[in-house]
Swiss-Prot record:
It comes from the Eukaryota. Its cofactor is heme b. GO terms for cellular component: mitochondrial inner membrane; respiratory chain complex III. Its main location: mitochondrion. This is Cytochrome b. The keyword DNA repair does not apply. It comes from Muntiacus vuquangensis.
């Protein structure tokens, strides 16, 4: 008799995805982040569900309901901070996951990569609408500033913004619909993640060498299940360190002030994981230009397969490209720093230079260096 896990209609799907899946024998810890993202998503959906049981999406009571969760609900404070810091962990894993894809040439799996980019946009949208819900000062003004960017769209811009707001300013209607979006989007993300996995399992995983590993595959369980559990434990350790010792480290103090449309905070800035894009947006002294640069800074990932000029897939044997990759990482960290600093003398020019460098590296320098490396290897 064959094993039930191989015959049962539901169990065989799980079996083929997580147990008997043929996996390359040499994938490093950088390949752990896919499963960590899955864990983050499950954690966010669960904590979010319990928060939604006590939250009210009304401008009069939203801020108070979050305070009530933290003060009066059993373990409400830990659920709230796990959800808030869980989002930060989600984005850390997401950025590493994308960086891994860039470094090892995983973007040559076109469908998997493109669904990944759609997932990135969806997660960013979810995080943005979620940040509005506590209805603090930064929630309100962040929502006002970011939604207002749509007014840069010619002809239909103003109507579009008022349609999204449900009125002439960010108000009760906006908060209610943002709560609805924030509730539904994680389930869309979960569905997209399954499609992402489906396409990945059509080709099998990439590996650090970028060379096909069909001749040397090992079963996913127990080898990578154990490896993923180790990653998960480290993720939870790091998350709980944040939650229990420094829950407000990554938050904004302004969000502990209830939203007030009559009082603008001196520095409006989003959560840390959007700062790089915010810096690119601010570095262009034109509204429409800034919005286009903001969208293009993420959308540029879709072009990666087209910009790949190297005859090797991975960067592991390409020291010049490696150097450029780490310059890109440093540039993104610089943009993140600039996004959180005030719009004044040294920061403006640094932000503009870092933004130019970002697009220059991806669109010009990387394809150019790859071609040079091909010639150096006399290919």
């Amino acid at each position: 008799m064959t094993n039930i896990r191989k015959t049962h209609p539901l169990m065989k799907i799980v079996n083929n995805a997580f147990i008997d899946l043929p996996a390359p024998s040499n994938i490093s810890s950088w390949w752990n982040f896919g499963s960590l993202l899955g864990i983050c998503l499950i954690l966010q959906i669960l904590t979010g569900l319990f928060l939604a049981m006590h939250y009210t999406s009304d401008t009069m009571t939203a801020f108070s309901s979050v305070a009530h969760i933290c003060r009066d609900v059993n373990y409400g404070w830990i659920i709230r901070y796990m959800h808030a810091n869980g989002a930060s962990m989600f984005f850390i894993c997401l950025f590493i996951h994308v960086g891994r894809g860039l470094y090892y040439g995983s973007y040559t799996f076109l469908e998997t990569w493109n669904i990944g980019v759609i997932l990135l946009f969806t997660v960013m949208a979810t995080a943005f609408v979620g940040y509005v819900l506590p209805w603090g000062q930064m929630s309100f003004w962040g929502a006002t500033v970011i939604t207002n960017l749509l007014s840069a769209i010619p002809y239909i811009g103003t109507n579009l913004v008022e349609w999204i707001w449900g009125g002439f300013s960010v108000d009760k209607a906006t908060l209610t619909r943002f709560f609805a979006f924030h509730f539904i989007l994680p389930f869309i993300i979960a569905a997209l993640a399954m499609v992402h996995l489906l396409f990945l399992h059509e080709t099998g995983s990439n590996n650090p060498t970028g060379i096909p590993s069909d001749a040397d595959k090992i079963p996913f369980x127990p080898y990578y299940t154990i490896k993923d559990i180790l990653g998960a434990l480290l993720l939870i350790l790091f998350l709980m360190l944040l939650v229990l010792f420094m829950p407000d480290l990554l938050g904004d103090p302004d969000n502990y002030t209830p939203a007030n449309p009559l009082n603008t905070p001196p520095h409006i800035k989003p959560e840390w994981y959007f700062l790089f894009a915010y810096a690119i947006l601010r570095s262009i002294p034109n509204k429409l230009g800034g919005v286009l640069a903001l969208i293009x800074s993420i959308l540029i990932l879709i072009l990666m397969p087209l910009l790949h000029t190297s005859k090797q897939r991975s960067m592991i044997f390409r020291p010049l490209s490696q150097c450029l990759f780490w310059i890109l990482v440093a540039d993104l960290l610089t943009l993140t720093w600039i996004g959180g600093x005030x719009v004044e003398h040294p920061f403006i020019i640094i932000g503009q230079l870092a933004s130019i460098l970002y697009f220059l590296i991806i669109l010009v320098l990387m394809p150019m260096i790859s071609t040079i490396e091909n010639n150096l290897l006399k290919w």
